[in-house]
C-alpha cells in the first residue's frame, strides 16, 4: 500500500463531508435559524482541521494532497444537493446520517489500513472521535431547539 494514495483517498472522504456540510449551510440560511447556522459553521471548522492535518501528513510523505472528490464522492454530494429540506429537522436528520456514514467509513479505513504509522492512526482515531462529537452536537441541537424528543 502506498500510504499517500490511501491517505488521499481518506482526504477525499473529508472533502466530501465538507462539501455536504456546505449544502446544509446553504439550505439552513432559508430558515433564519441562527443556532442551526452556528452549529453547521462549527462543524465545518472541524472538517477544515481534518483537511489541514491530513494534508500535512501527506505532504510530509513527499506527496501532493488531493483537492478533489472521488467519483463516488461526487455522486454522494450530488445526491445530497437534490434533497429538499422543508424544515431544520430535515437537515438535522440528513446531517446525522451523513456523519454516521463518515464515521463508519473512517472506522473501515482504519481497519483496512492497520499498517499505517502511529501518527496517521492517531489522526484517523481523532477524526472518528470528532464524528462522534458531531453526532452528539446534532442530538443536543435537536433536543434543545426542535423539541421533538
Regions found by a protein language model. Name each.
Residues 23, 42-45, 81:
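Long, non-catalytic architectural segments outside compact domain cores
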Residues 8, 34-45, 93-96, 121-129:
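Short, charged, amphipathic alpha-helical segments
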Residues 10, 17, 43, 50-53, ...:
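Charged, solvent-exposed faces of alpha-helical coiled-coils
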Residues 35-70, 138-144:
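Conserved alpha-helical segments that form or flank metal/cofactor-binding pockets of metalloenzymes
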Residues 56-89, 97, 101:
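Carboxylate-rich helix-loop segments that flank metal/cofactor sites and access channels
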Residues 98-149:
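Preference for long, well-ordered alpha-helical segments
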Residues 1-31, 89-114:
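Alpha-helical bundle segments that constitute or directly flank the non-heme di-iron/ferroxidase center
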